Amino acid sequence: MYARVTTFPGLAPERIKATLEEFTEHHLPRLEQAPGYRGVWVGVDYPGGRAIAVTYWETNDALHASDALANEMRAAAVTKAGVDRNRPPITDRYEMVLEKHSAAV
């Protein structure tokens, strides 16, 4: 499995919820249709004006094939969230080598 990790520093805290709603309603359905897509996690630090998005992909080829879609979604998020232009998003790619979840209680 492979992952694209994008951190969004410098977000306008008051615009984060609207940005998440737009992502969920308009961009997530397209993401879910992308070949090799396996999931997404989004974390938010509202007071700090930061967010992180992690998308998971079946293969490295699927990850790279989704680059154009990811670029489009990232640009939309930057516009909607009012990102500080001096603190643009940072994107990295990883091969996932370990996954461990706690046992159900």
What residue ranges belong to the model's regions?
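Short S/T/G/P-rich N-terminal loop/turn motif that feeds into the first structured element of a domain
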Residues: 1-52, 58-72, 79-105
